[in-house]
Each structure stands twice: as C-alpha cells, then as structure tokens.
C-alpha cells in the first residue's frame, strides 16, 4: 500500500513527510538517521498480508505519530508492536499482526549476532555454556539435515500473547548482552533434539510442536537440550526428618529443584507439634508454622531461573496437632509471621477421619514426635495404629471431627487452598 493511499488525506501525507524530515532514530551503532516513513509502512504491510480486518496504514500512522526524536530502532519496533496490540480489542487479527511484528524483531535480534541457522544457534549456546554436550554433538553431527528442517513461516501460527511469552521466558539468552540467541523455530527444534535419539525422531517431534498441535510442559520447554536438562514438571518429596539437619536439607532439595522450574509437593507430617519437648535444649517447639514461613520465603526467592515464581505445595496429615494453625496459613488477616502467601496447602486425609465426620464423632490430634509410625501407614494398618494410640491416651487433644472438617471447608472456600487429598485412596491405588 503506497503512502498516498486514498484513505490518508493531504494533511496526513504532509505531516508524515514533515516527520521524515524532522524526526530521527538512533541505530544500533549509535548513528542518527532520518525516519523513513515508507520503510515503516512497508514493514507493517508485509506483516499484515493475508489478515482480514487489519488496517496496516492505521497501525503505521499511529506508530509514526508516537515517535519522539532520537528514539532507538528497538523502541520504534516495540512501539509498532504495542500499537498493533492495542487494536486487538477491536479486531482479533491484530493479535497476529503484533505477533508477526514481534517475530521480525526476534529474527533481527538473532541475526545481528551472526546466527543464521539452527546449528549456529546451538553452537553459540555451547560457547556460552547453555547447551548440554549430548545435544551439541547430536546437532553438530546432523547439522545440515536439522538446518533444512526449520520452517520459519510457522512463526505466523502464534498469537501475540503466546509469542511474547515465548520471547520473554523461553528463548535462550546470551548471558552478558541478554539478547536471545534462538528464534521460536530454533527453540522448538532444540527442545525436540533434547528429547530424541535420532534425527528423524527429532524432525517428527519438531513438526508436531512447531505446529502448536502439542506442547510439552514448561520445565521441558525451559530445559530440554540445555546443560541442565531437568524436564519433569513436579517432584513429590517425603517429610523431612524432625531435626535441624533434616529440615534444612529439605529446604536445599526444594530450592535446587525449583531453580530449574520444578514444582514441589512436600509432606510435613514428621515435624513435631507446637509445645513438644526439644530434648537437645530442654525447650519447647514452636511447631511447624515457623518452618513453613521459612519455606515460603525460600520458594519466593528461588524463582525458577528468573522466569516465573517458584511453586510448592505442603501436605499435612489431619491428625497432626498443628492442623488448625496450618489451615490459617493462607488467611489475609492475623499475624503476618504466621501466614504463607506463596505456598499452596493440602490436607492429607485418611478414610477414618471422613468416617468420624459422617458419624459426628471426636477426632484425636497427635504430636508426631509421640506417634512417628503413623506417617508411613495407610488403610487398615493406619486405622489400627491410630486407634491403639488413641486408646493409650497419648493424643494432645480431641475436637469434633465435623468442626475440623468445617474449618477445612471454610479455608478452601475463602482462600482456594487447603486442598482435599485422600491418603488411603491414593496409596491403595498407587502402591
């Protein structure tokens, strides 16, 4: 579309011509040059090809009107992308236009580092310590075949939000200049190579995920083919031993898994309850809450490689005598030192508890320091051990089962947390 299109009046033509003579942009090398209005218009028109309902001239003129003298070319590119995205509420195809404009920016960023093929992208990653040795050798051995596999036009399948997320969080970046060293298609093929044993397998998988018909989980996308190929989404950890060494070792385990985008599920049943005797110091325990507060801060600090917040869920048995304090952890009121806003919470419920809820019977709460064996039992073995401990009178206190169940339901309704998970059903089906 020419700049003198009938939809642009004489005044607009004159104003854009004046812009081209008075406005300048700063190139990557620092030089200033006059704004080339026609170049901006042509760039938007190319990306708008085949998108019904999209007016490229509208985007171009709005972009030009938003320029300031001395803006960098990167700021100009970002302005055109944001301008397109602003029109998405009027016409959904502007999302694809914004995505295509962003794709050209990504491509330019990669090529400005003298990366013109998939194998060169991987070589750069190897040089910077980002790519694992097995994938490096795999790509070097099959470079020509893998390079020929890339289908750049598949970038056009992205909507804007999807491609922006890929650009911001998933593409590998140079450790020093923070520029991306792979395009979306290089990224997909790198993931495929990390999951494959031969070139044909990698190519088939690349074609599947680059078509967006299927995508692996985020940790796989983050880490496949890299020097830290931790690709599982979730890790379930047993309760730490009831000691300083045991608790801090579990903190370390969780931090290392979270570092490479693993979500954590961890039990906390073995840690002694509030008021329990600490024989080493002859003091009394503060219970599980201070430990979970520390874990909450750790999860927030180790933010999955800077890509997103860490995620962890703590499970607690319903017979633990700190269960009521546990259910208050996500409340928005109360002592902030006894609240954990980053952790997720889950109740680990035996069938015996639900039977007592149904019958409106009492439920006994125990200090795990006195009944350490209950943690590892389920089904009939748990029931007999629980009843034996109850008959021996070693519980801390008793409450109506329905009262505790009501607190669980209230916590779940008010905070969306305190998930209901069933110990016996889970173990009987999995073990």
Annotate the PLM regions.
Residues 2-431:
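Extended catalytic cores of very large enzyme megasubunits
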């Amino acid at each position: 579309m020419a700049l003198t299109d009938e939809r642009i009046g004489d005044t607009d033509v004159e104003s854009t011509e004046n812009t081209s003579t008075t406005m300048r942009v700063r190139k990557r090398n620092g030089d200033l040059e006059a704004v080339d209005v026609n170049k901006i218009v042509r760039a938007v028109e190319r990306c708008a090809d085949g998108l019904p309902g999209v007016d490229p001239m509208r985007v171009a003129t709005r972009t030009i009107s938003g320029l300031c003298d001395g803006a960098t070319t990167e700021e100009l590119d970002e302005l055109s992308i944001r301008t397109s995205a602003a029109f998405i509420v009027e016409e959904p195809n502007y999302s694809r236009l914004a995505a295509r404009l962003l794709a050209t920016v990504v491509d330019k960023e990669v090529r400005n580092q003298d990366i013109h093929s998939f194998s060169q992208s991987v070589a750069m990653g190897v040089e910077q310590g980002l790519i694992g040795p097995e994938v490096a050798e795999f790509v070097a051995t099959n470079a020509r075949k893998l390079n020929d596999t890339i289908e750049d036009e598949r970038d056009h399948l992205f909507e804007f939000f999807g491609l922006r997320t890929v650009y911001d969080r998933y593409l590998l970046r140079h450790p020093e200049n923070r520029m991306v060293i792979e395009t979306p298609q290089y990224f997909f093929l790198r993931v495929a190579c990390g999951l494959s044993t031969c070139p044909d397998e990698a190519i088939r998988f690349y074609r599947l995920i680059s078509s967006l018909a299927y995508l692996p989980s985020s940790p796989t996308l983050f880490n496949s083919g890299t020097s830290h190929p931790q690709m599982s989404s979730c890790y379930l950890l047993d309760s730490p031993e009831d000691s300083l060494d045991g608790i801090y070792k579990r903190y370390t385990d969780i931090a290392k898994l979270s570092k490479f985008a693993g979500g954590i599920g961890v039990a906390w049943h073995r840690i002694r309850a509030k008021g329990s005797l600490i024989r080493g110091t002859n003091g009394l325990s503060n219970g599980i809450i201070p430990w979970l507060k520390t874990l909450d801060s750790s999860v927030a600090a180790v933010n999955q490689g800077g890509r997103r917040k860490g995620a962890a869920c703590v499970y607690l048995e319903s017979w633990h005598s700190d269960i009521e304090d546990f259910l208050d952890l996500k409340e928005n009121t109360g002592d902030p030192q006894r609240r954990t806003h980053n952790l997720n919470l889950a109740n680990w419920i035996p069938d015996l508890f639900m039977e007592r809820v149904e019958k409106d019977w009492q439920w006994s709460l125990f200090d795990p320091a006195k009944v350490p064996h209950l943690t590892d039992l389920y089904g009939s073995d748990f029931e007999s051990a629980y009843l034996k401990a109850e008959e021996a009178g070693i519980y801390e206190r008793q409450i109506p089962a329905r009262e505790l169940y009501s607190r669980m339901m209230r916590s779940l309704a008010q905070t969306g947390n305190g998930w209901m998970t069933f110990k016996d059903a889970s173990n009987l089906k999995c073990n």
